Curated annotation (Swiss-Prot):
GO cellular component labels: nuclear speck; nucleoplasm; nucleus; plasma membrane
Major location (coarse): nucleus
Sites of the Glycyl lysine isopeptide (Lys-Gly) (interchain with G-Cter in SUMO2) crosslink: K96
Known role: Regulator of alternative splicing that specifically recognizes and binds N6-methyladenosine (m6A)-containing RNAs. M6A is a modification present at internal sites of mRNAs and some non-coding RNAs and plays a role in the efficiency of mRNA splicing, processing and stability. Acts as a key regulator of exon-inclusion or exon-skipping during alternative splicing via interaction with mRNA splicing factors SRSF3 and SRSF10.
Primary gene name: YTHDC1
Protein name (record): YTH domain-containing protein 1
Effect listed in the UniProt record for changing S362A: Does not affect ability to influence alternative splice site selection
Keywords, ordered alphabetically: Isopeptide bond, mRNA processing, mRNA splicing, Nucleus, Phosphoprotein, RNA-binding, Ubl conjugation
Effect of R475D: Does not affect ability to influence alternative splice site selection
Source species of the chain: Homo sapiens (Human)
Phenotype for W377A: Abolishes binding to N6-methyladenosine (m6A)-containing RNAs. Abolishes binding to m6A-containing mRNAs
Entry PTM: Tyrosine phosphorylated.
Effect of K361L: Does not affect ability to influence alternative splice site selection
Variant or mutagenesis effect after changing M438A: Reduced binding to N6-methyladenosine (m6A)-containing RNAs
Length: 727
């Protein structure tokens, strides 16, 4: 009866436990595959009874959920963990002894479980904390890509703990099964051999004592494992924190490198998030049993932690190799560009060698743009004179342009010619109150650099020739010292659109022209380099014959042996053709005509002396003052022919003089004819005037006589009338 009442109480308690722990039991069975395995083993065993299976399931419930129900009273845990063994064939004293020993054993196990639960409860928040902080430190994009890493890791930790607890409970179940099987065999054999009951009892007591010792040893081993696990977990947490700090530093370095360089990183964020998700899944799949669980946990965590962005770089060698290849290609490209720029710099230094530098200030950007487009520049007459002198004396003259209030230099160019006047006008944008007549001539320039240079990059340069002021400060036409100007020009960014070879070619051509001596002691006059066959309009003017090209020989040419002057050609200065030089240069046209008219007729034509053995034909009287027509040359008669250049030069000069003479005669005849016509008319009028005067005088005299007669008649009438009135 007592046993039946005790079984009923145990059944009621089990029903209450089932009601309280129904839903968590389903959850635990979902996540605890060992419980199902244990159930299948128990169902397959024929030795176990139905009551034994129910006690096994009741024993698993509190063992699994003891973590969630820490606040349960000790009595409920004791009642849940009671082992119900069949009491057939046993006396009441034996049963009481077994029951007492079983209750003592359960108390000891409950105390061990409480200690373990308290330690695990205190360990759980500390364990979860670094995972939370680690998750906080992730980027928001990675958090969006792996939304459930925290839950998976927690589930993995709980699975590890449940696996360790289930291993302990499985050990207890094995012990209880052995104990129950021993008692079952004892109870089945009691009906046959009642005399052996005492021996079975002694064996059962000894087995119970051995089981108690084994349980205590297992509990001590579990405590040691827990302590070792706690120490290992603390070490792992410290290692995790250090690795997280290293990852943060590496990510910061990567960001800095991305900000500094323009090259984009080939690694994608998906790869980083993938590596992290791998670490989370590894953590969620981890499971262990017994004492090997902690070691496996440590190894797997280290392996999972090893998959970091740094390790990913090592694994993704193809991406890094391609990135390195692109960097090598970039280095090759930069080396070729560097070689071109080095060549450009060497040419620029050659152009700037022994040059003179002038600062050119413009009032607006339009004039500088016009100068860049047409390659010309105009300045005030004061600066024009200065630049012309510099062009004659220096190897190169460099103009550095700057627009006022722009804060930059707009480029620099080299003078390629002196200023010239009379060309096509250039429409400069002039400030208010300034006319184009105030500007000087037009310079031709060759641009060396059309790119800009801010003043901030030349702040360290000062001009010694402008009181050591910064080179940006200066008026229009301010000259810059050689070293300062060279450094300033080298600061400009290279302009690959400019071919410096053309500039160097013009420099060498100018130097050759400058080094050639000029005959007759005339001052050197430079002409801008022009294409062959192109001449300015003033080159066709008959009064500018001195601008035409001549063949100039060095002074020692006429003294060289074997040189004979042409006896037919005599050097005559025909520039002024008998007119005084001051009248020819500064006089008006009327003065020139008057001077030429007073000069007298030209001398009679004298042909060139003939060569020996040649007859001279007689001159026609018409050609006394005019050149005779060209005659055919006689055949070759053993003498040297006249040089073509000498013939051409003599003919050219003589033809020019003849044209001038004819022109002056025609103009003189026209002028004299215009003046003689009115004089003849006046003379004719003067001749006809005496006749007309006589007639007029006679008419006037007759009119005067008639008027006098009329006056006398009028007087007589007046007198007669006055005498009548008096009478």
């Amino acid at each position: 009866m007592a046993a039946d009442s005790r079984e009923e109480k145990d059944g009621e308690l089990n029903v209450l436990d089932d009601i309280l722990t129904e839903v968590p039991e389903q959850d635990d069975e979902l996540y605890n595959p060992e419980s199902e395995q244990d159930k299948n083993e128990k169902k397959g065993s024929k030795r176990k009874s139905d009551r034994m299976e129910s006690t096994d399931t009741k024993r698993q419930k509190p063992s699994v959920h003891s973590r969630q129900l820490v606040s349960k009273p000790l009595s409920s845990s004791v009642s849940n963990n009671k082992r119900i063994v069949s009491t057939k064939g046993k006396s009441a004293t034996e049963y009481k002894n077994e029951e007492y020993q079983r209750s003592e054993r359960n108390k000891r196990l409950d105390a061990d479980r409480k200690i373990r639960l308290s330690s695990s409860a205190s360990r759980e928040p500390y364990k979860n904390q670094p995972e939370k902080t680690c998750v906080r430190k992730r980027d928001p994009e990675r958090r969006a890509k792996s939304p459930t890493p925290d839950g998976s890791e927690r589930i993995g930790l709980e699975v590890d703990r449940r696996a360790s607890r289930s291993s302990q409970s499985s050990k207890e179940e094995v012990n209880s099964e052995e104990y129950g099987s021993d008692h079952e065999t004892g109870s089945s054999g009691s009906s046959d051999e009642q005399g052996n009951n005492t021996e079975n009892e002694e064996e059962g007591v000894e087995e119970d004592v051995e089981e108690d010792e084994e349980v205590e040893e297992d509990a001590e081993e579990d405590e040691e494992v827990d302590e070792d696990g706690e120490e290992e977990e603390e070490e792992e947490e410290e290692e995790e924190e250090e690795e997280e700090e290293e990852e943060e530093e590496y990510e910061q370095d990567e960001r800095d490198q991305k900000e500094e360089g323009n090259d984009y990183d080939t690694r994608s964020e998906a790869s980083d998030s993938g590596s992290e998700s791998v670490s989370f899944t590894d953590g969620s799949v981890r499971s262990g049993s017994g004492t090997d669980g902690s070691d496996e946990k440590k190894k797997e965590r280290k392996r999972a932690r090893g998959i970091s962005p740094i390790v990913f770089d090592r694994s993704g060698s193809s991406a890094s190799e391609s990135y390195a290849g692109s960097e090598k290609k970039h280095e090759k490209l930069s080396s070729s560009v560097r070689a071109v720029r080095k060549d450009q710099t060497s040419k620029l230094k050659y152009v700037l060698q022994d040059a003179r530098f002038f600062l050119i200030k413009s009032n607006n950007h339009e004039n500088v743009s016009l100068a860049k487009a047409k390659g010309v520049w105009s300045t005030l007459p004061v600066n024009e004179k200065k630049l012309n002198l510099a062009f004659r004396s220096a190897r190169s003259v460099i103009l550095i342009f700057s627009v006022r209030e722009s804060g930059k230099f707009q480029g620099f160019a080299r003078l390629s010619s002196e200023s010239h006047h009379g060309g096509s006008p250039i429409h400069w944008v002039l400030p208010a109150g300034m006319s184009a007549k105030m500007l000087g001539g037009v310079f031709k320039i060759d641009w060396i650099c059309r790119r800009e240079l801010p003043f901030t990059k030349s702040a360290h340069l000062t001009n010694p020739w402008n009181e050591h002021k910064p080179v940006k400060i200066g008026r229009d036409g301010q000259e810059i010292e050689l070293e300062c100007g060279t450094q300033l020009c080298l600061l400009f960014p290279p302009d690959e659109s400019i071919d410096l070879y053309q500039v160097i070619h013009k420099m060498r051509h100018k130097r050759r022209m400058h080094s050639q001596p000029r005959s007759r002691g005339r001052p050197s006059r430079r002409e801008p380099v022009r294409d062959v066959g192109r001449r300015r309009p003033e080159d066709y003017d008959i009064h500018n014959s001195r601008k035409k090209p001549r063949i100039d020989y060095p002074p020692e040419f006429h003294q060289r042996p074997g040189y004979l002057k042409d006896p037919r050609y005599q050097e005559v200065d025909r520039r002024f053709s008998g007119v005084r030089r001051d009248v020819f240069l500064n006089g008006s046209y009327n003065d020139y005509v008057r001077e030429f008219h007073n000069m007298g007729p030209p001398p009679p034509w004298q042909g060139m002396p003939p060569y020996p053995g040649m007859e001279q034909p007689p001159h026609h009287p018409y050609y006394q003052h005019h050149a005779p027509p060209p005659q055919a040359h006689p055949p070759y008669s053993g003498h040297h022919p006249v040089p073509h250049e000498a013939r051409y030069r003599d003919k050219r000069v003589h033809d020019y003089d003849m044209r001038v003479d004819d022109f002056l005669r025609r103009t003189q005849a026209v002028v004299s004819g215009r003046r003689s016509r009115p004089r003849e008319r006046d003379r004719e009028r003067e001749r006809d005037r005496p006749r007309d005067n006589r007639r007029d005088r006679e008419r006037d005299r007759g009119r005067d006589r008639e008027r006098e007669r009329e006056r006398l008649c009028d007087r007589d009438r007046d007198r007669g009338e006055r005498g009548r009135y008096r009478r």
